[in-house]
């Protein structure tokens, strides 16, 4: 499991005084202020949020030491993390941090491993499970399925696997044998 958990991402600058858009991933967005300091992915660079206010679909934050737009631009798309031990433990087996899914086996309903989880994406219409397929006939580098009970009926973090419903498994038909009639001209 990851020792640092992604809690926010810095977006584009907001104005000319060093404020930034902040996309918060905690269940309670205001809780991001409770985690001090936040760090980059390496854990070496530290950031403190001096002020936070809600905007339309994000937050606007002032980060200590960032006083102008140029400094704010340098932080665009920076992920902010906290140590796992700073967060409350999940309540039960059905509760987990998204980071806990990275690296889990993706299996079909028959239990055949079809890939490994590489990310959980949110493009605005709900979470999407992204995985790197291991099936030899699959040419895509990654595949995506909705992260819903219909598409992913089982999430077994202790068992290190997620199950993808058959309707969402991409399988390419085998290549036709040489000379086999494929119905084409």
Swiss-Prot record:
InterPro entries: PRC_barrel-like_sf (IPR011033), PRC_RimM (IPR056792), RimM (IPR011961), RimM_N (IPR002676), RimM_N_sf (IPR036976), Transl_B-barrel_sf (IPR009000). It is found in: Cytoplasm. GO terms for biological process: ribosomal small subunit biogenesis; rRNA processing. The keyword Oxidoreductase does not apply. The keyword Chaperone applies. Residues 92-168 form the PRC barrel domain. GO terms for molecular function: ribosome binding. Gene3D superfamilies: PRC-barrel domain, RimM. GO terms for cellular component: cytoplasm; ribosome. It comes from the Bacteria. Keywords: Chaperone, Cytoplasm, Ribosome biogenesis, rRNA processing. Binds ribosomal protein uS19. An accessory protein needed during the final step in the assembly of 30S ribosomal subunit, possibly for assembly of the head region. Essential for efficient processing of 16S rRNA. May be needed both before and after RbfA during the maturation of 16S rRNA. It has affinity for free ribosomal 30S subunits but not for 70S ribosomes. Belongs to the RimM family. The PRC barrel domain binds ribosomal protein uS19. This is Ribosome maturation factor RimM.
